[in-house]
Every structure is written in C-alpha cells, then in structure tokens.
Amino acid sequence: MLTSPLVVTYNISLAIVTNDVFFPIDIRDFREVLAKNGYQIEPLTKSLPPRPAHFQASGYFARKNEFVVNIETINNQLGLEGSSSERIVEAFNELIDIVEKQIQVNLKSNVKFYESIGSYGIQATESAIKQFGLLTNMIIFNQKIENILSIPTQLFGLKFCPKNAMPNQIEWFNIDVYPDVLQPNKFACNVVFRSKEKDKVDKWVSQDKELIKNIIEVMKLE
C-alpha cells in the first residue's frame, strides 16, 4: 500500500500585474491606508518627494499577520508573499479590496495577468533520487544519453508546462520536481502559474498541494 506523500509549502506568492504605464497607486496614499487597516508599514529608505512626483518602490512594503506585501512599481506589480497556500487568496482579496474601495483604484480593470510562485517540499518514502532512476518510461532515453556520455546517467528532475507554449506567454505554468539537494528522502518542487483570469490562478493555489501530491504518486507507479 502506497503512503500518501506529505506536501509542505515553503513559500508562496500571489500577485497582480497591470498594463498601466505608471504604477497606478500613489505610494503616499497606499502607506496611509494600509496603516489604517492594520498593516505594519516598512520604513522608507529615502524620503518621499512632494506631490505629484512619482515615487518608485521595490520589494518589501508592509506586513499583516503572516503575509508580506511586495510592490514593484517599475513592473506595475502588487502582491503578497507567505507560507500558507490555504490563506493567501483571502488575504490577497482583502488587499485588492482595500485598494479599490479606499484608494479608488480599480486594478482589475487593466490587469495584464495574475501570477503565483510557490516552492514546496515533499516527503519521499525512499530516496527521491532513486525514484527518478526507476521511471520505467525513461529507461531507454537514459540509456541513449549514457551511450553519448559514456557515463551511467539518470534523470535528476522533471519539468512540466503547457503543451506547445512558451514562458513569455501570459497563459503559462511550469512545475519543476527534483530531489532535495540537502535531504535525499525529500522532493523539492517549484511552481509558476500565470493567467489573465484570476479564477484560474486562485483555483491552482487552492489545490496546489493536492496536485503536487498526485504528481509524486504517479511517479511512484511509473
């Protein structure tokens, strides 16, 4: 009987990127409104210029509970980062709602895409490296590579993406699964999921650990 693998979220982010020429939120207003809504605001490294001058910001901007607000004004990106797949969608929706209702900026009206980036750890029942070497559908391929290199060879990881798609497309995902370099009985997994449709990204985030677990279970059977 196969033991269902335990999937742990190490880090996950959820962000919106807009098509605006300039970042659509005034940083001064954003700091004030977030503070009123219980966010801890990161101190500025330089003073804010007088209005209406545009202010560039990058990286850690504020924090509330377990999530950090990240901002990239050059890329028109606003997002959250933390370690809870289960709660990040709700926290992200709260952040967007604050922007729309209290700053009167409708980010969704000019959205370019939404994106989630996650890193995960998965406990293996035996050596993760060994399990890649046992993938029967890859044995012939591995043998051909061995013949080229004249060195015993096996897979060290797998990467999945949409069929016939390229990474510079808006509708995109990639899932990397590979042995944890420091813990041989664990898999590591990195995921990027991007779409113009928020529902698609939210659905992925809500199911991420279950889907990753299913991928690992399929590998056990191959």
PLM segments and residue spans:
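N-terminal low-complexity, intrinsically disordered segments
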Residues: 1-71
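Short beta-strand-to-loop capping motifs
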Residues: 14-21, 80-84, 121-124, 191-196
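Short, conserved charged micro-motifs
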Residues: 17-28, 88-91, 126-132, 199-205
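A common structural junction motif
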Residues: 34-40, 96-107, 213-216
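Short amphipathic beta-strand starts and helix->beta connectors
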Residues: 63-67, 99-103, 171-174
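Aromatic- and glycine-enriched beta-alpha-beta binding-site module
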Residues: 71-113
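Aromatic/basic-lined ligand-recognition segments
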Residues: 112-188
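Mixed-charge, glycine-accented linear interaction segment located at domain edges/termini
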Residues: 167-222
